[in-house]
């Protein structure tokens, strides 16, 4: 990562580093114009919540992981911010879950898709991961994939508060 003019003792240092990574990703064509707004909205809530993961958010994360583990055909659906900030971690997760990732973005352009797919392919190659990357074809359908309601699932008791 390029040098960023941020003092490591600054209370929002990690936030500044993430913001810088998004700035770089935008320059590389990975992000939509609204990406910084979306990230900033999340950062505002993080700040208001005291920079801590609240119990309900932690439980939601565990619930999502449990749903992915139980799914017959899980797929991790990624946007530009996810690729820019957590592409490596998400590809590693996909390999552990034995599932593909897909680029699924609202503001789709051929250039942006090429940049996002290229970034994921580079990470995949560098880490020697066995993960299928979907999304190159704009009208493609994933066989057997249907919208699912998770209201019938119950959270395992180990995740209860």
Model region roles, listed by residue range:
Residues 96-147:
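Long, charge-dense
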Residues 1-102, 110-112, 118:
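Electropositive, gly/pro-rich neighborhoods at or near active sites that engage anionic ligands
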Residues 77-80, 104, 136, 153:
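Short His-Asn-centered micro-motif
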């Amino acid at each position: 990562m390029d040098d960023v003019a941020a003092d490591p003792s600054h209370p929002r240092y990690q936030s500044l580093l993430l913001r810088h990574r998004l700035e770089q990703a935008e320059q590389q064509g990975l992000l939509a114009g609204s990406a910084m707004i979306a990230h900033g909205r999340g950062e505002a809530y993080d700040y208001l919540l005291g920079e801590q993961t609240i119990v309900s958010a932690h439980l939601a994360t565990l619930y999502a992981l449990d749903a992915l583990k139980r799914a017959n055909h899980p797929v991790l659906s990624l946007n530009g911010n996810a690729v820019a900030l957590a592409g490596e971690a998400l590809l590693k997760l996909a390999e552990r879950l034995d599932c593909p990732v897909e680029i699924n973005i609202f503001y789709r352009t051929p250039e942006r898709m090429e940049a996002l797919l290229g970034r994921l392919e580079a990470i995949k190659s560098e880490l020697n991961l066995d993960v299928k990357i979907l999304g190159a074809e704009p009208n493609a359908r994933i066989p057997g994939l249907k919208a699912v309601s998770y209201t019938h699932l119950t959270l395992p008791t180990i995740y209860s508060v």
